[in-house]
Amino acid sequence: LTMMARKMKETDSEEEIREAFRVFDKDGNGFISAAELRHVMTNLGEKLTDEEVDEMIREADIDGDGQVNYEEFVAMMTSK
């Protein structure tokens, strides 16, 4: 039973992460750009400078392509 609950919890958080990624990935291309990140953060009431947004992208952008893909997003969300 504990194992089942743990599995459901994992699935739940995976689905939440997937949903969060969809919110950020406005154009649905599978990547979060700096512009998309800025847009969502602004809607959440966060006033960030371009430098702050770029820094957030750099921190999450493991492969260095300037965007955050789903795998990078998951790594960022689960690293805490």
From Swiss-Prot:
UniProtKB keywords: Calcium, Metal-binding, Repeat
Listed InterPro entries: CALM/Myosin/TropC-like (IPR050230), EF-hand-dom_pair (IPR011992), EF_Hand_1_Ca_BS (IPR018247), EF_hand_dom (IPR002048)
Gene3D superfamilies in the cross-refs: EF-hand (1.10.238.10)
Alphabetized Pfam families for the sequence: EF-hand_7
GO cellular component: cytoplasm
Domain EF-hand: 12-47, 48-80
Sample GO molecular function, one term: calcium ion binding
Record GO biological process: microtubule cytoskeleton organization
Protein family per UniProt: Belongs to the calmodulin family.
Function: Calmodulin mediates the control of a large number of enzymes, ion channels and other proteins by Ca(2+). Among the enzymes to be stimulated by the calmodulin-Ca(2+) complex are a number of protein kinases and phosphatases.
Protein name: Calmodulin
